[in-house]
């Protein structure tokens, strides 16, 4: 066995409390190197005749990526504390892996050899809102969704959909427009909407906030927002707003005071200013988002800034009953601020959803004291490469997803925000080269995978567009210009996700990933409920074997309702190019 590939640490994604009674312990080994792993464990204070008392239990392999196998044990220590190690076997070889290294037999004279989970404290649990696991999100860019009140449209706003957008163009989308189309969202099956910023700002995107306590007048007023939230809640739809706390806009009052009064401004320490007077060329002499001078970075460690922003966060929850905050550029704000942010909003509404925008490994923010989830860009990247661009093989795709899933605790994955497109990325149909079949596969994967899926407005009807601003076109409301077949496909998948708990909350296992014909088979299992997803990501028809012994089972085609008994040991499924099928597996 390759010792250098065997790895565990007693924290984060390798050792964590899944709930108030259960510990999840993971082990990493070289791919295809180890035959069998057992967890060796016991209470650190259980001794008899000078020997530590321990027991063993088998660990199960939960997946593999390109380099490693991952093993899991779920244990409920009766006294909520544990010392533990691992017994690995390959062929005739046996190793006992402990915190102090490798042994041929398990030491019993001192528990200090072993890994330690000192105590399972309920207060330390990572606890995301349970409702998020069942939510299907819909992201709305308010300026481009619908114009429900032309009287408040910006001066010079273009007729709806009359031309392609520019970085500075306006079309008059507003909150009333969203209210007017809630029935559309409810019909699709949406149970959560995520609004990009709605606070007063000069731009069309509103990420340059001028006043965090006011709705932008071109979007509506506070009464309109209250109506929107109330109507959404009546339809079982949650509402999440976008918080831009990393930076403000150029017109933000305190920054304007600094521009006016320079070093004498009482707000000068609200920002990261290197010297006075402020300059923007060749680059700003104050910290900004990227190098954008119109977006000065806020000093969130400053007590007044912290108090101001925490007041913002709690105000919109307390007064408008919103259900979540999406946090822009969350990784560039200090961890202490986010800890206090969580305490403040959770004290007000314990099941509020805290979602961070982080594009890289986000484990430091997902330990239970800051965020409930992050936007799952690694999943989106892998899905777009495999299904749309076709520059990733089936096995590479499965490996990538297993790596993502094993990078975080299970409950983190269950609450992950699984997007495929957004206001920052090209439209799905555009990335797919206009091939609707590929878009269907993307939605199939997204709506059957672990996590909380989010659809970007218009992707469900086949809207097109490249990078910003092309991906921010006006929503198409003319039925003749909507792809109704794609809409019905998405609607059916959402309905199946609601019907089958395994699709929402089940464990995922990749059963086959064939690189020759690029087919993929994975299963979602929750208790006795199993759904198999079989995909042909190829431009040729394929006969795909089901990689399970299905004898004695009923197979129900979830797309057609066809139900048949599996009598043969192996079954093959015939799929057209870019075809797919979902089977519920039921016992006779």
Curated annotation (Swiss-Prot):
Activity's dependence on pH: Optimum pH is 6.0 for hydrolysis of alpha-cyclodextrin.
Domain of life the protein comes from: Bacteria
Pfam families hit by this protein: Alpha-amylase, Alpha-amylase_N, Malt_amylase_C
Record has Hydrolase as a keyword: yes
Site, as annotated: Transition state stabilizer: 424
Record comment: activity regulation: No metal dependence, but Mn(2+) increases the activity with alpha-cyclodextrin as substrate. No effect on the activity with presence or absence of Ca(2+), Zn(2+), Tween-20 or EDTA.
GO molecular function: cyclomaltodextrinase activity; identical protein binding; protein homodimerization activity
Record: residues binding substrate: 247, 326, 423-424, 468, 472
Sequence similarity: Belongs to the glycosyl hydrolase 13 family.
Subunit structure, as described in the record: Exists as a monomer or a homodimer in solution. Homodimer is more active and stable than the monomer.
Protein name stated in the entry: Cyclomaltodextrinase
Organism: Geobacillus thermopakistaniensis (strain MAS1)
């Amino acid at each position: 066995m390759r010792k250098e590939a065997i790895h565990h640490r007693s924290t984060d994604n390798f050792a964590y409390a899944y709930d108030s009674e259960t510990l999840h312990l993971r082990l990493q080994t070289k791919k295809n190197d180890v035959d069998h792993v057992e967890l060796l464990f016991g209470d650190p204070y259980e001794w008899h005749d000078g020997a530590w008392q321990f027991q063993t239990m088998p660990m199960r392999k939960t997946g593999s990526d390109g380099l490693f196998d991952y093993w899991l044990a779920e244990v409920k220590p009766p006294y909520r504390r544990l010392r533990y190690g691992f017994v690995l076997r390959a062929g005739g070889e046996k190793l006992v892996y402990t915190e102090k290294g490798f042994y041929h037999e398990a030491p019993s004279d001192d528990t200090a050899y072993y890994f330690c989970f000192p105590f399972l404290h309920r207060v330390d649990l990572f606890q995301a809102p349970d409702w998020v696991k069942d939510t299907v999100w819909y992201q709305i860019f308010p300026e481009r969704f619908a114009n429900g009140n032309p009287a408040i449209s910006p001066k010079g706003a273009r007729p709806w959909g009359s031309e392609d957008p520019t970085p500075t163009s306006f079309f008059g989308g507003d909150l009333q427009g969203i209210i007017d189309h809630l029935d559309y969202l409810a019909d699709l099956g949406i149970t959560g909407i995520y609004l990009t910023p709605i606070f007063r700002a000069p731009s069309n995107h509103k990420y340059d906030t001028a006043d965090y306590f006011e709705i932008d007048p071109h979007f509506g007023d506070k009464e309109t927002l209250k109506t929107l939230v109330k109507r959404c809640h009546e339809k079982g739809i949650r509402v999440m707003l976008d918080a831009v706390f990393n930076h403000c806009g150029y017109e933000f009052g305190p920054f304007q005071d600094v521009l006016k009064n320079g070093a004498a401004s009482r707000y000068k320490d609200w920002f990261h200013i290197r010297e006075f007077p402020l300059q923007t060329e060749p680059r700003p002499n104050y910290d900004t988002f990227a190098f954008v001078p119109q977006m000065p970075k806020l000093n969130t460690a400053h007590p007044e800034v912290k108090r101001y922003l925490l007041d913002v966060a709690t105000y919109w929850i307390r007064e408008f009953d919103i259900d979540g905050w999406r946090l822009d550029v969350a990784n560039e704000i200090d961890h202490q601020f986010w800890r206090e942010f969580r305490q403040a909003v959770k004290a007000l509404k314990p099941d509020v959803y805290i979602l961070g925008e982080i594009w890289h490994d986000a484990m430091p923010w997902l330990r239970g004291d800051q965020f409930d989830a992050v936007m799952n860009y690694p999943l989106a990247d892998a899905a777009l490469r495999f299904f749309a661009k076709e520059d990733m093989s089936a096995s590479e795709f499965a490996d990538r997803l297993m790596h993502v899933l094993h990078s975080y605790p299970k409950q983190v994955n269950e609450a992950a925000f699984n997007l495929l497109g957004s206001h920052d990325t090209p439209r799905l149909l555009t990335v797919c080269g206009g091939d609707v079949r590929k878009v269907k596969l993307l939605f199939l994967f997204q709506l059957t995978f672990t996590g909380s899926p989010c659809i970007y407005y218009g992707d469900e009807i086949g809207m097109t567009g490249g990078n910003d601003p092309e991906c921010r076109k006006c929503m198409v409301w003319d039925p003749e210009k909507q792809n109704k077949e794609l809409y019905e496909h998405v609607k059916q998948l959402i309905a199946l996700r609601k019907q089958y708990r395994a699709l929402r909350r089940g464990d995922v296992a990749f059963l086959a990933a064939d690189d020759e014909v690029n087919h993929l088979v994975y299963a979602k299992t929750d208790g006795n409920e199993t759904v198999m997803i079989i995909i042909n990501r190829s431009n040729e028809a394929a006969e795909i074997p089901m990689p399970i012994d299905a004898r004695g089972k009923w197979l129900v085609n979830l797309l057609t309702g066809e139900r048949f008994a599996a009598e043969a040991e192996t079954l093959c499924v015939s799929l057209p190019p870019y075809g797919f099928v979902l089977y519920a597996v039921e016992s006779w």
